Curated annotation (Swiss-Prot):
Protein's name in the database: S-adenosylmethionine decarboxylase proenzyme
Species for this entry: Nitrosococcus oceani (strain ATCC 19707 / BCRC 17464 / JCM 30415 / NCIMB 11848 / C-107)
Annotated site, Cleavage (non-hydrolytic), chain positions: K116, S117
Known EC number: 4.1.1.50
InterPro entries linked: AdoMetDC_fam_prok, S-AdoMet_deCO2ase_bac, S-AdoMet_deCO2ase_core
Pathways per UniProt: Amine and polyamine biosynthesis; S-adenosylmethioninamine biosynthesis; S-adenosylmethioninamine from S-adenosyl-L-methionine: step 1/1
Domain of life assignment: Bacteria
């Protein structure tokens, strides 16, 4: 059961640092060298620095932050990154915020008290040289020094970056004092990151939690339940392939998803023979 938190009267500034690390993976099968190159080019365009800046700007709006500075870069031959420095919103006194353990907006305006916090995103496209599998990873970090948790932006991020696999880590560090001098090492209720995710999203994903409550560390990973081969073929259609080839490709893609989800190599007879 989630422990309820009463409003804490603080002595001075809220010194808690709350960090959300959000990693998404997109997987596809591109059979030829040309298709693999086109996939990388597509991902590079779809997730260029301009679009990533827009996503982080929306995140800043959701958590009620002012953007102080933006640094962004597209890389050769591939990849992009954006870093934002954010600070507290001056309109804070006119708006309300909440740390309720519930899904965040898509998006809607919230306000928090921030000081020298930051948002970052980096992308990592790659492809296997032989077996046709190509993957794309985006890492987003939202770190706030203040009252509103970056988990308020989680729902927006999931819907903005529709992905095959999502890995999330949330931690709270430091402490803040109440007016009597007592320390508070967390200032909001949480027993799972899943409670901040919309029900329709949870219904579409397999989800696993690994939490260390006494250390204020929360980990959730998600993998899509439904599998349609056409969704994973780049530059081709399943109907153009023989049934045996469809099955072989599906096995490769599913194996790739499982390995990423569980974070380890999983033996598969056909795939192992191609690795040797």
């Amino acid at each position: 059961m989630t422990r309820a938190f009463n409003k804490i009267k603080l002595h001075g500034f809220n010194n808690l640092t709350k960090t959300l690390s959000f990693n998404v993976y997109d997987i596809c099968y591109a059979q030829t060298f040309q298709q693999r190159r086109e996939y990388i080019e597509y991902i590079d365009e779809e997730y260029n620095a301009e679009r990533l800046t827009h996503i982080l700007t929306e995140v800043a709006e959701i958590i009620g932050a002012n953007i102080l500075n933006v640094a962004r870069q597209n890389y050769e031959p591939q990849g992009a990154s954006v870093t934002m420095l954010i600070a507290e919103d001056e309109t804070e006194i006119h708006q309300q915020f909440t740390n309720a353990e519930e899904p965040g907006p898509l998006p809607e305006s919230l306000v928090c008290h921030l000081d020298k916090s930051h948002l970052t995103v980096h992308t990592y496209p790659e492809s296997h040289p032989e077996n046709g599998i190509s993957t794309f990873r985006a890492d987003i970090d939202v770190s706030t020094c203040g009252r509103v948790s970056p988990l308020r932006a989680l729902n927006y991020l999931i819907h903005s970056l529709e992905s095959d696999i999502v890995t999330m880590d949330y931690r709270v560090r430091g402490f803040t004092r109440n007016v009597y001098g007592g320390k508070h090492f967390i200032d909001h209720a949480i027993n799972s990151i899943q409670n901040f995710i919309a029900e329709d999203t949870k219904g579409r994903y397999h989800m696993i939690d690994v939490n260390i409550y006494q250390e204020n560390i929360f980990h959730t990973k998600m993998m899509l339940k439904d599998f349609e081969l056409d969704d994973y073929l780049f530059g081709g259609n399943a109907c153009d392939l023989a049934s045996q080839e469809q099955q072989a490709i599906a096995d490769r893609v599913k194996n790739e998803m499982l390995e990423i989800f569980y974070g380890k190599n999983i033996p598969h007879p056909d795939i192992e023979s191609s690795r040797r």
